[in-house]
């Protein structure tokens, strides 16, 4: 066997369909070269690595600070609570805090994340520094002048960014990505966001059926963050965000965790919450926790020819070996402690 070649056997969840198959996966120089079926037997589970489709990890420096008042008083730029805290935090403390959070995501099998990075060019550079040398890579969506040195722009809302048209024009001219918060507290900014044909919408918690139909028709993915929506008080019902309606209309949903100050960026917890509160089927939930990887250009699904980005989960040391439905067990019970190996392309 080539020194750059590795063969991993397990019950793998193959392709976007997450078809459960006992296989031997041959990885050579970071690429999945061959997936070969083998005889069924007791095997570890092999799953795609996860992608956190929406974060604000810098505000983790204010982790679990008491949050009172309306959402806009907490997170809206430029004078919301989180922005005041970020401005007052020394740069090295921000970098150290972000690196700790990225390391926590890495330990949980999260290979990448899309972060709305405040603070202009220095903010983008701080996140790049924080992620240096780690295998959990950011898609950085900058603000306040940081858009063109990042992977693109992360817009707080189409209704509260002065000169948004000019920002979008610059981003598009540079061939960068455009992501916009929309419909988090009401549907009033969704239509305006859609006029910019974004590459990603975040939240859509209160988007109307007509708006969701338009989003589906345009093929724009939606990063939903239900735990954050509940914590910030913009929902108290399984009807919001309207996950079932999104799926029925053909929307492509991704899963994010939003503000680290309020929510641990752990997609295992997010998946379990969605399963419990919204009752979606396990395959839909797990697929949404991986699909955001398309933002990197190389999705993490397990297919021949793609970069190898997958997790080996051993159910044997815990009671997970009792599972009659491994995919449901992954969504509702698994976590970082069950991961015994990560196969990650460089």
Language model segments and positions:
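Metal-coordinating catalytic core of metallo-dependent amide/deamination hydrolases
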Residues: 84, 88-89, 95-97, 114-199
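Residue-level marker for buried hydrophobic side chains located in beta-strands
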Residues: 49-51, 178-179, 253-255
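Active-site gating loops and adjacent loop-to-helix segments of metal-dependent hydrolytic enzymes
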Residues: 60-96, 191-196, 216-222, 274-280
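Divalent metal-coordination and catalytic microenvironments
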Residues: 10-11, 25, 30, 43, ...
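C-terminal cap of metal-dependent C-N hydrolases
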Residues: 291, 304-346
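Catalytic pocket of metal/acid-base enzymes, prominently hydrolases
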Residues: 44, 55-83, 99-113, 124-141
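Active-site-adjacent C-terminal substructures of enzyme catalytic domains
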Residues: 187-301, 313-318, 333-335
